[in-house]
């Protein structure tokens, strides 16, 4: 039925159907990270997926067990499928070794660097890179283009009917349009003797293709998820009392689960968070739920958060995720870092949706972080050089959207895990709020040394206070350092985040 934003009907849609759970405190601190861990892999129905324990020792095993993969589609219609069996498989060195397109470019480069195969390879390269017809015709004699054979019989067998050996295309048609687009800015008029120019084009194509992969929105999302989780797993002192689990679910799957059932107590999320852990006590109760998603103040997202918060409250564990800057009236914090540009929604539908969410009691179990934080440096000679080829991930000094930004929920989880490891359940008044040792990108811009903020933007006190007033959990960068600070553990209602502590 249609939702009237003025009569509070949004909240009334989400009920447990009469079921309630009483939370019993246990000495364990269990974290559940829900996210799209398997990417584009085929998987069982969400209702059949278990929560899986993960730690430093089995981290790569879990990546493989989930058959983690991603299908990257490009504007020219080409596609690349990447499969991951470990965190290292996200590294450009491994991608370079495993992706067939790079093998074809490696082969072409090797043949261009050999005097025995240069002429045929040059002809092939010019076709691939779309040089003019007159530049494609070999300038040297036919004999120079013939493949070199160990003996006369081999030479004869290698010739096509009619005599001279013709260059054989070795690169697939799939790579053709993609590579020609990548190298177009680097094209120069060449002949067969300009070996270095052709090799440079191959290198430009190789780097361009790698950038397209690393910066593809789907690859970035999957890498940011796993590196954010690894940040948490690597730093948390897991033990019999402190454990981390993952539940594989895309944002759409989570939303569908929550809205498809007649009551929230019939959902998969309720089963995992409440029924198994609280009502039947088959599992220890959860202490913290992470949602590796980005939410905006739109109807579908607010409806999902309302349902999640009710289940989280019943489980006695807060749900922490990320709120997009749209809630502040801007699309990007980086492009609008001045807090005076952040506006409230006024009397708009967005404001009514947000008010409905904030107004429900269970939202005290809902914490939304902003901004994101960095989980790896850009690749390059001055930061993280590759072993396989010379590669600069950024073509300019700094490309904000192409950094790897992970969900702030992982930072919050690490701080809470640290607090529990140090103080146990007596941590309430001694919660960790700082993280250091983050990747710090230092670069030159207009002759000046620049330190990239580890949490997207340099945050001022005014900015922090404005985010707190909006009910968010700000992650603030310490200027010129590898540290960030969580301003406050608060719910979107402005009250303290409701947790077992």
Where are the regions a protein language model picked out?
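A short, well-structured beta->alpha microelement
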Residues: 244-280
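Short, well-ordered alpha-helical packing segments
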Residues: 106-109, 176, 203-211, 223-230, ...
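Compact, well-ordered interaction domains used in eukaryotic information-processing assemblies
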Residues: 2-94
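A glycine- and small-residue-enriched flexible loop/hinge signal that marks low-structured segments
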Residues: 137-194, 214, 234-237, 248-249, ...
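Long, charged, helix-rich clamp/arm modules that form nucleic acid-engaging surfaces
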Residues: 69-195, 202-206
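Extended assembly-interface regions of large multimeric machines
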Residues: 187, 196-259
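Well-ordered, non-membrane alpha-helical segments in soluble/globular domains
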Residues: 223-226, 260-275, 300-311
């Amino acid at each position: 039925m249609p939702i009237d934003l003025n009569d509070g009907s949004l909240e009334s849609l989400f009920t447990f159907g009469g079921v309630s759970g009483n939370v019993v405190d246990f000495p364990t601190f269990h974290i559940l990270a829900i996210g799209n861990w398997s990417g584009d892999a085929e998987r069982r129905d969400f209702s059949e997926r278990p929560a899986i324990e993960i730690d430093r020792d089995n981290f790569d095993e879990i990546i493989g067990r989930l058959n983690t993969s991603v299908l990257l589609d490009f504007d020219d219609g080409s596609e690349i499928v990447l499969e991951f069996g470990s965190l290292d498989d996200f590294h450009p060195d491994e991608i370079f070794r495993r992706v067939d397109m790079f093998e074809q470019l490696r082969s072409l480069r090797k043949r261009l660097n050999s005097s025995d195969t240069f002429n045929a390879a040059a002809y092939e390269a010019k076709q691939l890179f779309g040089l003019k017809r007159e530049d494609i015709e070999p300038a040297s004699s036919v004999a120079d283009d013939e493949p070199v054979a160990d003996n006369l019989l081999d030479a004869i067998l290698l010739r096509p009917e009619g005599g001279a050996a013709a260059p054989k295309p070795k690169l697939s048609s799939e790579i053709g349009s993609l590579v020609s687009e990548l190298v177009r800015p680097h094209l120069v008029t060449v002949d067969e003797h300009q070996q270095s120019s052709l090799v440079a084009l191959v290198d430009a194509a190789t780097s361009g293709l790698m950038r397209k992969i690393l910066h593809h929105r789907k690859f970035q999302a999957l890498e940011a998820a796993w590196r954010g989780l690894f940040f948490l797993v690597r730093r948390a002192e897991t033990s019999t009392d402190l454990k981390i689990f993952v539940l594989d679910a895309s944002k759409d799957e989570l939303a569908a689960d929550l809205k498809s059932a007649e009551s929230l107590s019939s959902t998969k999320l309720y089963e995992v968070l409440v029924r198994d852990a609280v009502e039947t006590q088959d599992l220890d109760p959860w202490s913290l739920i992470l949602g590796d998603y980005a939410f905006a103040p739109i109807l579908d997202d607010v409806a999902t958060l309302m349902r999640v918060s009710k289940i989280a409250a019943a489980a006695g564990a807060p749900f922490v995720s990320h709120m997009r800057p749209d809630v502040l009236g801007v699309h990007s914090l980086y492009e609008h870092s001045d807090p005076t540009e952040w506006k409230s929604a006024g009397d708009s539908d967005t404001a009514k949706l947000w008010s409905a969410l904030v107004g429900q009691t269970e939202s005290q179990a809902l914490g939304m972080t902003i901004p994101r934080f960095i989980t790896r440096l850009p690749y390059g000679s001055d930061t993280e050089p590759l072993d396989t080829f010379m590669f600069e991930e950024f073509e300019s000094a700094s490309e904000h959207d192409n950094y790897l930004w992970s969900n702030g929920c992982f930072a919050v989880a690490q701080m809470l895990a640290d607090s529990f490891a140090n103080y146990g359940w007596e941590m309430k008044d001694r919660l960790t709020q700082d993280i250091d040792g983050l990747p710090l990108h230092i670069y030159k811009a207009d002759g000046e040394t620049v330190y990239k903020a580890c949490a997207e933007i340099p945050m001022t006190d005014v900015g922090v206070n404005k985010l707190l007033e909006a009910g968010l959990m700000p992650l603030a960068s310490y200027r010129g350092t590898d540290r960030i600070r969580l301003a406050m553990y608060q719910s979107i209602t402005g009250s303290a985040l409701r947790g077992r502590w």
